[in-house]
């Protein structure tokens, strides 16, 4: 599945290089028009990252996201700055289909597990941003990549499998925003090890060949941001490569 994505800072469409707020590119685009274009080209799921909220949860762009959800028919997955159950339930109440939870799953796993039990495993996607060290360990970063986490991807998957983990978004931080291609070995490894999880691949997608490579790796979906914004290819072309299931 092709999952077009936009990142938002104070209502503007942006891209960060490797999660660094100091390496930001701003695009002179309307978030709604951009997402409508992706919807019209056949996207079955859209992905929005609230980067303002990720940095400061008090400044989450909930009203903007609510207006986008109202105007679009396609299901929307939203991440960025969700730290409390109230914030999670607010997003679900305004019509967001699935909420992405990142750092909190590492920092407060028991709390996040309770949300899986209460809201169901379809309502939550874990975002696992990994740094692969020299030993090949997949260490999950926390706090918008601004500090290390210490837990491995495998240990987190084991922990959340007990509450029915179904959706996980995995980014190899070293590839994000680089257009250097996805880490297909990573996706092949985890989709083989945990076939029950719908893995969303993210980071580094530059060409349709990259899209095809991720599809072949066994991932269930691919999040594409920058490549679409700079017209490397279209959503329509990507779906031709990887038809929606």
From Swiss-Prot:
Pfam family, one: His_biosynth
Catalytic activity: 1-(5-phospho-beta-D-ribosyl)-5-[(5-phospho-beta-D-ribosylamino)methylideneamino]imidazole-4-carboxamide = 5-[(5-phospho-1-deoxy-D-ribulos-1-ylimino)methylamino]-1-(5-phospho-beta-D-ribosyl)imidazole-4-carboxamide
Keywords, ordered alphabetically: Amino-acid biosynthesis, Cytoplasm, Histidine biosynthesis, Isomerase
Gene Ontology MF terms in the entry: 1-(5-phosphoribosyl)-5-[(5-phosphoribosylamino)methylideneamino]imidazole-4-carboxamide isomerase activity
GO biological processes: L-histidine biosynthetic process; L-tryptophan biosynthetic process
Main location: cytoplasm
Enzyme Commission number(s) from the entry: 5.3.1.16
Pathway as given in its UniProt record: Amino-acid biosynthesis; L-histidine biosynthesis; L-histidine from 5-phospho-alpha-D-ribose 1-diphosphate: step 4/9
UniProt-annotated location(s): Cytoplasm
Alphabetical list of InterPro entries matching this protein: Aldolase_TIM (IPR013785), His_biosynth (IPR006062), HisA_bact_arch (IPR006063), Isoase_HisA-like (IPR044524), Isoase_HisA-like_bact (IPR023016), RibuloseP-bd_barrel (IPR011060)
UniProt-listed Gene3D superfamilies: Aldolase class I
Record's keyword annotation contains 4Fe-4S: no
Family affiliation: Belongs to the HisA/HisF family.
Protein name: 1-(5-phosphoribosyl)-5-[(5-phosphoribosylamino)methylideneamino] imidazole-4-carboxamide isomerase
Organism: Shewanella piezotolerans (strain WP3 / JCM 13877)
Encoding gene (name): hisA
């Amino acid at each position: 599945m092709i999952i077009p994505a936009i990142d938002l800072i104070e209502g503007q469409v942006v891209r960060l290089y490797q999660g660094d707020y100091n390496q930001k590119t701003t695009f002179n685009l309307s978030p709604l028009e951009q997402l409508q274009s992706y919807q019209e080209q056949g996207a079955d799921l859209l992905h929005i990252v609230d980067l303002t909220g990720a940095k400061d949860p008090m400044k989450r762009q909930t009203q903007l996201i609510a207006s986008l959800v109202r105007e679009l028919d396609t299901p929307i997955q939203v991440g960025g700055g969700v730290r409390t159950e109230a914030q999670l339930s607010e997003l679900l109440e305004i019509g967001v289909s699935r909420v992405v939870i990142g750092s909190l799953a590492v920092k407060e796993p028991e709390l996040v597990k309770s949300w899986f039990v209460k809201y169901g495993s379809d309502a939550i996607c874990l975002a696992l941003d990994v740094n692969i060290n020299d030993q090949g360990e997949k260490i999950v970063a926390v706090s918008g990549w601004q500090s290390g986490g210490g837990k491995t991807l495998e240990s987190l998957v084991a922990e959340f499998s007990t509450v029915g983990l179904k959706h996980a978004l995995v980014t190899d931080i070293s590839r994000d925003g680089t257009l250097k291609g996805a880490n297909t070995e990573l996706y092949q490894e985890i989709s083989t090890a945990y076939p029950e999880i719908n893995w969303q691949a993210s980071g580094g997608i530059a060409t349709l060949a990259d899209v095809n490579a991720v599809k072949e790796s066994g991932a269930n979906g691919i999040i594409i941001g920058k490549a679409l914004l700079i017209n490397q290819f279209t959503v329509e072309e990507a779906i031709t490569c990887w038809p929606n299931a």
